[in-house]
Amino acid sequence: YNDPYIEINGAKISLDKINSIFDYEKLDKFANLSKQNNILEIGAGSGRTSQSILTFNNVKYVICDIPPALYISYERLKKVFPDKKIDLVYMEQDKDKLNTKINELDISFIMPDQLNLIRKNFFDLTLAIDCIHEMDKKTVKKFFSDINQLSKIFCFSVWKKCSLPFSNILTKDHVFDYYQNGYEVPSNWTKQFEEELDFPSNFIFCGYKIE
């Protein structure tokens, strides 16, 4: 992908890789990735986190995102994992057919409107890295509602405090303060992990068990 990098002892080091290492360390510390079978990632972006997880763990992986990011991560993972069964299934609206395809594939790419078609509690782990704070609160609430039905545990990393400057211009509904429950985590989720990130230092990583 010709990302900017520096070379150290023959290894190409990029910001993308450094971020992925930090994310992987937190994810594995919370969820023990080797014990997870089915993983859902919300907002995978370029696919850097999914690449790191899939490099070291043989899991079934579903990415839920919107264009153009959906296609970027698709092309990246197709290139990195040529032997895996990977496909875009975002056009499938039949519940049975969608679940069958997900079961047949190693990596599936869907869009948010398909989450309610997936079998209840199918995912051992759901993650959302550096994306929840980019949504308005109505969208976050909808994702959390879907995750509530689909996953056993959920982890995400977000800004400790942020706002969406072009969503009603800094109104209360679009200001997120993690320590004031600004992300409105459902009451049936039990927090089991919380750590501040070393980089970026204004991020927090947390993990929840869904009861």
PLM features: residue spans?
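Conserved Class I S-adenosyl-L-methionine-dependent methyltransferase catalytic core
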Residues: 1-34
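Conserved SAM-binding loop of SAM-dependent methyltransferases across substrates and taxa
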Residues: 46-57
